[in-house]
Amino acid sequence: MKLNSIEVIGKRKSSIAKIILFLPKDGGGEILINGEKAFNYLQNNLRTLKVVCSPFELLNINNYKVHAYVKGGGLSGQADAIKLAISKSLSVFIEKEDKKKLKVNGFLTRNSLCKERRKYGLKKARKAPQFSKR
């Protein structure tokens, strides 16, 4: 049995996900994150699991195997990083129409929003002490 595989990196906030995507001829969808099943790693959180699986659901792909290695950030950022990496890796295997679907739905775009740094003289990034005119 020959496996087609590809290795891709996805980033979100301070999370970095490196995935290896296998597309075997048969077999169900299996996602392992840092050696654990995705449902267990994401602490039984259905929202984050749905985020990770959304590229496969959009393209109606049932035969896949994903090995993801993530570090940094929280569960939500890690899930988004995995989603981006999966989408990028799928874009290599699929036709142009399906790639366009991914692009239109924002799956191939990196969300560059990250935490703003704290400035000196302020309490937080933008929270200033109360201003008194007199």
UniProtKB/Swiss-Prot annotation:
One GO MF term attached to the UniProt entry: RNA binding
Superkingdom to which the source organism belongs: Eukaryota
BP-aspect Gene Ontology terms: translation
Entry annotated with the keyword Plastid: yes
Cysteine-cysteine disulfides: none
Subcellular location: Plastid, Chloroplast
Pfam families, A to Z: Ribosomal_S9
Family per record: Belongs to the universal ribosomal protein uS9 family.
Protein name per the record: Small ribosomal subunit protein uS9c
